[in-house]
Amino acid sequence: VFELGLLNIHCHLIDNLDKVGGQCAELYPEKPIYDIPSRPVVTGQELTDELIKQINPFKPKFHLNQQVDKIDKSEYGWIVETSVGVKIEAKCIIIAAGAGSFVPRKPPIENIDQFENKNVFYAVRNKSMFENKKLLIAGGGDSALDWTNELSKSSNVTLIHRRKEFRAAPDSVGRMQELESQGKVSFLKGTIKNIKRGSENKIVISYQSDENINDIEVDYLLPF
């Protein structure tokens, strides 16, 4: 949107989310980001807010909570129709979909939906709710490692992954391993198999490690 504004091109932005900001706003508004030029650290929401301020002078029009359903050629250029019936005529269409619509990466557990938004969360939108709680973070990518490192500052965090090798950035992996060596993070090699209710609003996670099935009781499960 910003680059189009510099070219004096008025922009309509269509997004399936209910807010502007994509991944930063939807998946990790409170997650510290360290790889933005000139910014030692910035949260996803702070970055989103600053980018919105940057494009405001160009007065883009946002169409949220909808997606493109149909594109037709017209005499003028193109007619785009969204899932709520909005029609936009434009000379050109730019697809900047990133990873596409966000779908939580759910572990293949039959009853996991019973615990969603209670004990199971697929994104961290409010870090304070996890303070002084026992967390199990599942995954081996950047989000899993970054949140393990960040939430360990104020929570009891265990990371579980099916193997000891990770997809995350080497720096994040190194920091997690250092925290583990200091006793600030625990690591389990295994695969989650089942969830059941525990004591005092907690949940019990059953996981398979090699040939063994073990249990761990936690307040929250965060699969990434």
Which role does the model predict for each range below?
Residues 1-16, 85, 89-106:
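N-terminal-biased segments
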Residues 2-3, 25-26, 105-109, 148-150, ...:
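Short amphipathic alpha-helical segments
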Residues 17-42, 169-175:
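Conserved N-terminal glycine-rich FAD pyrophosphate-binding loop of Rossmann-like flavoproteins
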Residues 19, 36-63:
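Conserved FAD-binding subdomain of flavin-dependent enzymes
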Residues 52-82, 88-90, 152-224:
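A Rossmann-like FAD-binding core segment of flavoenzymes
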Residues 84, 93, 97-123, 208-224:
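Glycine-rich beta-alpha-beta "Rossmann" dinucleotide-binding loop(s) and their flanking helix/strand
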